[in-house]
A protein has these predicted regions:
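A short helix-loop
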Residues: 8-9, 16-18, 23-28, 130-134, ...
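Glycine-rich beta-strand-to-loop/alpha-helix junction loops that act as flexible
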Residues: 76-79, 142-144, 262-270
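A contiguous, well-structured pocket-lining segment that forms one wall/lid of small-molecule binding clefts
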Residues: 190-261, 267-284, 304-312
Length: 315
């Protein structure tokens, strides 16, 4: 049995097909939304337009790589997070496409959230199959969240901590755009950071399970004004994010000892952050970039789980 996942976030249009019998992702595709040089993202109306324009061709591409006539359920990100009042218009494009696809074939439509998709993709790809069935601490770190969550799979989520102001992805993107890189700028900031061989000493603000990242933007601006080069400042920015996560994770582990700690979200694609955190947090799980950044893989997996089609008893 195949399931189709659709996610239309403020960053990318994403589709994925999951095979419940094999327990594998058959194929996936993603297209970043076009952002003009110097801008930090799109207005919601523009994001909705670009998703609507991209989806037909992307579904056609997906159909060339998988037999969509074998899809038996459709999952879609209908809103950002599974909390009351969570809403962004960009997700309407995905809901519209998913609804049309499911109705045309009399298939069940499963409405999920963008955050649940991130969590499911990370748990699936973390290298330990049991993670998707048991309790874990999950960080969702992106341009719109810096959340620490207590999760049982991706279905039962309890918020534990977050940023009180700026999100990690916002800090990274603002630095990257300031340096002249396209949005989203995470990959370029990571490339620059890898060029720096100097030691940096990040200064962070963490109180229990809550962090503050608003000072990071000002710190980076001051470092640039003081004459530090781009690689140094990029490394400083990413290690500040890394040290923030280390402190939040270890504080959470003091309250929930022994739990695995899984890192999801686009910012967690950084090799520098991955190395820094895994050396300091026990039982930390990072995943390959395509499972960390925006994707529809987790949504296709959750559609299968909601239908009771995966995991199968033979696995």
């Amino acid at each position: 049995m195949l399931t189709l996942g659709i996610d239309t976030s403020n960053y990318a249009t994403s589709l994925a097909v999951f095979d419940t019998d094999a327990g594998e992702v058959v194929c996936d595709c993603k297209k970043f939304l076009p952002v003009k040089e110097g801008q930090l993202g799109l207005r919601q109306s523009d994001a909705l337009f670009h998703h609507t324009a991209a989806l037909p061709a992307m579904l056609s591409e997906l159909g060339a790589r998988a037999d969509l006539t074998q899809v038996r359920a459709v999952g879609v990100s209908a809103r950002p997070r599974p909390v009351e009042g969570s809403y962004m218009p960009c997700f309407l494009a995905g809901v519209s496409a998913a609804t049309a696809f499911s109705l045309s074939r009399a298939l069940p439509l499963i409405e999920l959230t963008h955050q649940q998709g991130h969590i499911a993709a990370a748990l699936y790809a973390a290298g330990d199959f049991t993670l998707i069935e048991r309790e874990s601490l999950v960080f969702h770190v992106s341009g719109g969240t810096t959340d620490l969550l207590l999760c049982h799979g991706a279905e039962r989520i309890t918020p534990l901590g977050t940023s009180s102001d700026l999100y990690a992805g916002q800090a990274v993107d603002r630095l990257g755009v300031k340096l002249g890189f396209p949005f989203p700028a995470g990959v370029y900031v990571s490339e620059q950071a890898a060029l720096c061989k100097e030691k940096v000493h990040p200064k962070v603000s963490v109180h229990g399970l809550t962090c503050s990242l608003s000072g990071l933007e000002n710190q980076c601006a001051k470092l640039l004004a003081d004459g530090h080069d781009a690689p140094y400042v990029c490394k400083y920015c990413l290690l500040c994010v890394g040290e923030t996560l280390v402190r939040m994770a270890n504080n959470a582990l003091a309250e929930h000892p022994g739990l695995p700690v899984v890192f999801a979200g686009g910012v967690m694609s950084s090799d520098l952050i991955r190395t820094y955190v895994t050396n300091r947090v026990p039982n930390a799980h990072f995943v390959p970039g395509k499972f960390a950044s925006d994707n529809a893989i987790g949504i296709s997996i959750l559609a299968a789980r909601e239908c009771g089609a995966w995991p199968t008893t033979s696995m």
